[in-house]
Amino acid sequence: MNKHIITEISPLSEKDCLFIVERYKTEFTYPLHNHKEYELNFVENGAGVRRIVGDSVEEIGDYDLVLLCGDNLEHVWEQGNCQSKQIREITIQFSPDLFSNNFIDKKQFTSIRKMLDRAQKGLSFPLHAVMKVYSTIDSFLKV
């Protein structure tokens, strides 16, 4: 693993609530990095890719969906044992400020607040949950 960690500067501006990018790739080459933004990262056709989030190292299946909410949480997806040449990745970044002014503290958002808290060290969703939100993630690309 690369010992050098870059601090990513997101293209997310103060006037944006989301930054969404879709990439098709033959391999993962982006280095170990961190950033202050929250991130939802989706990978398709990635069986064998090695996901590193903080001190967690896992080999993923064909689909992967991870929520990262830790301030400057180090993370990277590496090629690992992946043989696919048609990897799809969708990254959605949003500012922690999106939940400012006690908005997230309202009782109706208790489950969301708990999920964001659990994602401080990275939260990987099970396959059945990924499949439930697959079309929703696709629809974000049309925004």
Regions found by a protein language model. Name each.
Residues 2-12, 69-139:
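A hydrophobic/aromatic-rich effector-binding and dimerization subdomain
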Residues 1-67, 71-73:
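Generic protein-terminus/edge-of-domain signal
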Residues 142-143:
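An accessory alpha-helical subdomain
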